[in-house]
Amino acid sequence: MRYLPLTENDRREMLGVIGAKSVDELFRDVPERARREGLVDLPRRQGELEVERMLGRMAAKNTPAASVPFFVGAGAYRHHVPAAVDHLIQRSEFLTSYTPYQPEITQGTLQYLFEFQTQVAMITGMEVANASMYDGATGCGEAVLMAHRVTKRRKAVLSGTLHPQYAAVVQNLSDFADYELEVMPPALPGQAEDILAHIHDDISCVVVQTPGFFGELHDLRPIAEAAHAKGALLIAVVPEILSLGAVTPPGEMGADIVVGEGQSIGNGLNFGGPYVGLFATREKYMRQMPGRLCGETVDADGNRGFVLTLSTREQHIRREKATSNICTNSGLCCLAFTIHMSLLGEEGYKRLARINHAAAVKLAERLAKVPGVEILNQAFFNEFTMRLPKPAAEVVDALVDKGVIGGLPASRLLPGVAEVEDLLIVASTEINTEADRAAYEAALKEVL
């Protein structure tokens, strides 16, 4: 007996229900240039060895971050990950585990999530943290939705310090969640952003990033005071979580919700994902927090144990009452974060942050000596922005030809903004050596 799960009649019936004439109509949003007609012309009857060689030749056309001096950041940072991290997360109990619905058989998973939450709460200066989001951007979007629930208001203000891709996620949610956004223009380093003038009685929250998209560190205290005076919440976004080892945590500056990207700890660049979103808030807002919360308890015999304390998502309760519809979280990335953070310890975390800051300062001092280069930042962590005498995209391409990946042209994420055409965002971490910095300085002198 043959099982045919989708016949032509099935397709016609399904298309009729949704009002589409053909399957192709379902993909009309995909640009024509991105579509492929027919089968891919692959070589036939190749053995495993031949396939490996062919793929190796294709891969050799790329320039891996580890093979050249690499100075790209802007939300994804290359840090050293201890070998112990990957070794431990590949244990089958962790690698293939699922959501810990049955605490009697998932104590290991629940405990590391509990430890993860504790670490996130400590470094952000908040009282409670959840068991992670998909990434920093989705965490930011969920934070805005949470602020609406808490304040019963429907308008948010996005600072120009916010990463454009984070802002795009929030804007995407606003289109479907029926709330209003006020998006401020990019906050260039050295230029004061008049965000206080945009905080009114009708807003639910103000979203500010530190370090900002251009690397600038920001004092959140005056913004927090202004927001609280109007009954609004302050959402602090931290795309480089290692920075909290060197600066005052957002929670201590008055933030009500802190979201961030945890990729820098325990995780590689991973081709842009999967990453691990961090989400922390104050205890009084805990029941409005999205995602899951693991808690500590005791069993019937008085033994310490861990459980899913809160999990108010649409799978468990009525959709209209759920705080989010987030499903499988970034559990394995959480574990990598937790292991790396445990290996570092509090002092190691702070020391690594100091090393990163020193690396960026040394690079900025070198590049500032190059004729035509201007460092714009007054205060930064491990990332800064410089103004060049020609378009930054052209300079980056020329640097690649010299064997240096020199940073991210701001225009790549802010197309059409004339003020950023000559701005290059540069990151330097503990990975970068003095030889890397010297190579960058020499290459930049040549291409300018």
Swiss-Prot record:
Which InterPro entries did the record assign?
GcvPA, GDC-P_N, GDC_P, PyrdxlP-dep_Trfase, PyrdxlP-dep_Trfase_major, PyrdxlP-dep_Trfase_small
Question: What is the protein's given name?
Answer: Probable glycine dehydrogenase (decarboxylating) subunit 1
Q: Which GO terms describe its biological process?
A: glycine decarboxylation via glycine cleavage system; nucleoside metabolic process
What is known about its subunit structure?
The glycine cleavage system is composed of four proteins: P, T, L and H. In this organism, the P 'protein' is a heterodimer of two subunits.
Outline what the protein does: The glycine cleavage system catalyzes the degradation of glycine. The P protein binds the alpha-amino group of glycine through its pyridoxal phosphate cofactor; CO(2) is released and the remaining methylamine moiety is then transferred to the lipoamide cofactor of the H protein.
Family matches, as NCBIfam families: PRK00451.1 (NF001696)
Q: What is its EC number?
A: 1.4.4.2
Q: Mind listing the UniProt keywords for this protein, alphabetically?
A: Oxidoreductase
This chain is encoded by the gene named gcvPA
Which family does the record assign? Belongs to the GcvP family. N-terminal subunit subfamily.
Keyword Lipoprotein in the entry? The reply is: no
Which major enzyme category is it? Answer: oxidoreductase
State the Gene Ontology terms under molecular function: glycine dehydrogenase (decarboxylating) activity
Q: So what does this thing catalyse?
A: N(6)-[(R)-lipoyl]-L-lysyl-[glycine-cleavage complex H protein] + glycine + H(+) = N(6)-[(R)-S(8)-aminomethyldihydrolipoyl]-L-lysyl-[glycine-cleavage complex H protein] + CO2
Positions of disulphide bridges: none
Domain of life, per the record? Bacteria
